[in-house]
């Protein structure tokens, strides 16, 4: 049997996503109960070293913080390849810079054969700053777009994950065009939480757009 691992590397994040567990939905502030900290590299290695089974992929998720906030994210990525050939990173895209993404893409894309290396999942929910900010408050859209562009145009594996809200579903055509321009696969998913929940009527219109653009 093959096992996958999901690690929360950090509880730090610059975003104030209102449906995120780390964020107070009413104020946008960090939850009072949340202790901000970064995982130690030794903790990561100590969890994996004794594991006796084959590992499919290691994922650094953004459940309580963005992994790119971790000051040693590079070391975690590099160390992961002692245990697997496939590393996934989830991010809002607004951290680091295009040079960082370019170097990572050129170093870790298909570096041990086809479909191995680093796979980025970018959570960006709009085609402009104001729209993305409605959920991803605190994220610089222009920076996120530049980072996505650097990753995908340099051969990086991954996907653009676009949550559909009542305020952004009409941007499906533009998002598809932008994804195509940078060679990115785009994945749309309907938000099912109360903040920004799309109406049934608009959801049906969005479904028709998704069919039209075959996504």
Briefly describe each language-model feature range.
Residues 1-119, 130-157, 181-182, 188-214:
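Conserved alpha-helical substructure of the radical SAM core
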Residues 92-96, 126, 164-168:
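Short beta->alpha connector loops
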Residues 120-125:
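Conserved phosphate-donor/acceptor-positioning beta-strand/loop module used by diverse small-molecule
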Residues 160:
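Positively charged interface segments
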Residues 166-180:
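Catalytic cores of alpha/beta
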């Amino acid at each position: 049997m093959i096992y996958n691992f999901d690690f929360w590397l950090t509880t730090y994040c610059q975003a104030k996503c209102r449906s995120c567990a780390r964020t107070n939905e009413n104020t946008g502030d960090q939850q009072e109960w949340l202790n901000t900290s970064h995982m130690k590299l030794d903790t990561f290695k100590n969890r994996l070293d004794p594991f006796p089974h084959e590992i499919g992929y290691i994922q650094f998720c953004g459940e309580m913080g963005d992994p790119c906030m971790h000051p040693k994210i590079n070391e975690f990525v590099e160390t992961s390849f002692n245990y697997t050939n496939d590393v996934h990173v989830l991010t809002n895209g607004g951290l680091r810079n295009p040079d960082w993404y370019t170097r990572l893409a050129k170093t870790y894309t298909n570096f041990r054969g086809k479909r191995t290396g680093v796979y980025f999942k970018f959570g960006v929910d709009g085609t402009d700053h104001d729209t993305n900010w409605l959920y991803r408050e605190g994220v610089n859209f222009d920076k996120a777009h530049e980072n996505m562009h650097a990753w995908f145009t340099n051969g990086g594996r991954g996907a653009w994950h676009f949550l559909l809200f009542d305020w952004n579903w009409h941007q499906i055509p533009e998002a598809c065009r932008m994804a195509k321009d940078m060679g990115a696969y785009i994945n749309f998913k309907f938000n099912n939480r109360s903040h920004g929940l799309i109406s049934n009527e608009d959801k049906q219109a969005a479904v028709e757009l998704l069919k039209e653009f075959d996504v």
